[in-house]
């Protein structure tokens, strides 16, 4: 019998493998991306202290969004999280794509964060 693999379960396994090798420090925190069907979330995390330094998502009221699950929204979230991180004194991050392919909304968020001043 042919069984179809659960995409989210395989993503979680992939993310766990990557997270075993990735850690964010106070000097170079981790930029984590979570993508749902309706929204996209980004956090800058210091894993040593277990603290989220800044975050942004499509749920933020200050972002004027037409849709929340498209590339334009991901771009605005990337710009927003990068601006907040630079204001908090973070210039370099480690990018954690969350087990997702570096394509589409994840890629748009990453490129917007780079253009807004984060280095990774």
Swiss-Prot record:
<comment type="subunit">
    <text>Part of the 50S ribosomal subunit; part of the 5S rRNA/L5/L18/L25 subcomplex. Contacts the 5S and 23S rRNAs.</text>
</comment>
<dbReference type="Pfam" id="PF00861">
    <property type="entry name" value="Ribosomal_L18p"/>
</dbReference>
<dbReference type="InterPro" id="IPR005484">
    <property type="entry name" value="Ribosomal_uL18_bac/euk"/>
</dbReference>
<dbReference type="GO" id="GO:0006412">
    <property type="term" value="P:translation"/>
</dbReference>
<keyword id="KW-0694">RNA-binding</keyword>
<dbReference type="GO" id="GO:0008097">
    <property type="term" value="F:5S rRNA binding"/>
</dbReference>
<keyword id="KW-0689">Ribosomal protein</keyword>
<dbReference type="GO" id="GO:0003735">
    <property type="term" value="F:structural constituent of ribosome"/>
</dbReference>
<keyword id="KW-0687">Ribonucleoprotein</keyword>
<dbReference type="InterPro" id="IPR004389">
    <property type="entry name" value="Ribosomal_uL18_bac-type"/>
</dbReference>
<comment type="similarity">
    <text>Belongs to the universal ribosomal protein uL18 family.</text>
</comment>
<dbReference type="GO" id="GO:0022625">
    <property type="term" value="C:cytosolic large ribosomal subunit"/>
</dbReference>
<protein>
    <recommendedName>
        <fullName>Large ribosomal subunit protein uL18</fullName>
    </recommendedName>
</protein>
<keyword id="KW-0699">rRNA-binding</keyword>
<comment type="function">
    <text>This is one of the proteins that bind and probably mediate the attachment of the 5S RNA into the large ribosomal subunit, where it forms part of the central protuberance.</text>
</comment>
